[in-house]
């Protein structure tokens, strides 16, 4: 039907007769000559229709935006003064001899070049939204990323194996999406949150190197970087330690960035421990482009008169820390108030600060803040020296439980860093975070929970801590972070049943519960399971970063909203009563007063 894509035509095609198919992006009448910008996925071509071809001219007069056209035309150079070097086809235009309307179009709900569209309108008419060049560029980037990753894995001996979409529910983290069984009354499948257990079983089966680009499902509260269904590049290997796995994966990502976007990532990626990341940056996924750091002050605040600081410094699990912002003394009261409200999102009760007007004067004359009079001089000296504060700076403080301080100051560090230009100028800052704790403490239920998942292996020499001091046990886990986003996470897995049982004991998972939920894995570990480990990448997150998109919804063809709805298909929806009866399900009506 066509001989060329619109966006592929250039000076080399001058004199050729070509057939193009696409959508009328824009139609213009100029002094008896009609111009149509014809668009397909590869770009735009300018079609010229003059009265010398009366039949084509008559049809062109009736063309409106988004009509689907087939055009036979001759490629010629654009007249002098009309060349547009901003587009690949800008040196040529196409003189039409024949036009056929393959399908007319209603007036679209929005113009494709409207940059102020409501996302709700875009998602409701996604099939129109996906015609926008920016969206097509994003999805083609996604395809190229997936293809290069697949080719890289194939070249290194990885085998692509599909794992089940219908599996059993083992709710340890987020809620499962449940699928009722019609055949087995009262029983349910679950959609997988990850292929974790199946890929471990493939290693037990001897496949050695596995990968899969697969959908995963989590029924959780949504954020800008979350979707109820998401795509994961899933990898598992046998007989490799964490260093070898990280080397393979890092090389794969470095090659992919180079091939897809001609970006040179550092070799090797920097590494820091989880403890260092939390202490210095308040996050296990720090944006290393931001130059601000968190400074520890707990030890010097134990005997100050300011009770907020002293209370946190003397309480078990408390922390007092600070961020110095160069030239921050110029911040207005309203800006400081806005930052105070921001940290409250993370549980902070407020945001103390000191404006450093004169760093040489450790009193209220040199340091401007209501809290200065309640902090003795040795502590003030420690604040200035440890943070490196200079005249004209501001120092923000966090004082609370360490978890709250880390999250609040970590988020504030990133926010101020980007808003006030405290970044180092790098476009890309990859990082490995290693030496994660095995567990974190759930204070509400007074129990340990797995920081990653319960199948992560403890570091060598930490196995005995599983029973004696679970909070001190470190794991063979590693996360790849890029510009403050966790794009990949993995670990060496437990391959011995007795070690897996010790982890379940630390998590207060009884032998009966472990056998009920994970009996198939525990059984498999008794039949010569090899040492194994792996990693999974969030493809959506990775492409979002590479595309410079604001949300992962911009790199997914048909995403859900933040309320987990598809506005286009109106999913989820009510189903027929007959379908529910076949599944032995009754919908209980919600009581608005309840």
Swiss-Prot record:
Keyword vocabulary terms for this entry: Aminoacyl-tRNA synthetase, ATP-binding, Cytoplasm, Ligase, Nucleotide-binding, Protein biosynthesis
Example GO molecular function: aspartate-tRNA ligase activity
Catalysis: reaction(s): tRNA(Asx) + L-aspartate + ATP = L-aspartyl-tRNA(Asx) + AMP + diphosphate
Enzyme class: ligase
UniProt KW Acyltransferase keyword: no
Family matches, as SUPFAM superfamilies: Class II aaRS and biotin synthetases, GAD domain-like, Nucleic acid-binding proteins
PROSITE patterns: AA_TRNA_LIGASE_II (PS50862)
E.C. no: 6.1.1.23
Residues engaged in binding L-aspartate: 172, 218, 452, 493
Main location: cytoplasm
GO biological process, one term: aspartyl-tRNA aminoacylation
The keyword Mitochondrion appears for this protein: no
Region (Aspartate): 196-199
GO cellular component: cytoplasm
InterPro entries listed in its UniProt record: Aa-tRNA-synt_II, aa-tRNA-synth_II, aa-tRNA-synth_II/BPL/LPL, Asp-tRNA-ligase_1, Asp-tRNA-ligase_1_N, Asp/Asn-tRNA-synth_IIb, AspRS_core, GAD-like_sf
Protein localization: Cytoplasm
Matching Pfam families: GAD, tRNA-synt_2, tRNA_anti-codon
UniProt site positions, description: Important for tRNA non-discrimination: 30, 81
Domain of life: Bacteria
UniProt: ATP binding residues: 218-220, 227, 486, 538-541
The family this protein is said to belong to: Belongs to the class-II aminoacyl-tRNA synthetase family. Type 1 subfamily.
Subunit structure, as described in the record: Homodimer.
Protein task: Aspartyl-tRNA synthetase with relaxed tRNA specificity since it is able to aspartylate not only its cognate tRNA(Asp) but also tRNA(Asn). Reaction proceeds in two steps: L-aspartate is first activated by ATP to form Asp-AMP and then transferred to the acceptor end of tRNA(Asp/Asn).
Protein name: Aspartate--tRNA(Asp/Asn) ligase
Lineage, highest ranks first: Bacteria, Pseudomonadati, Pseudomonadota, Betaproteobacteria, Nitrosomonadales
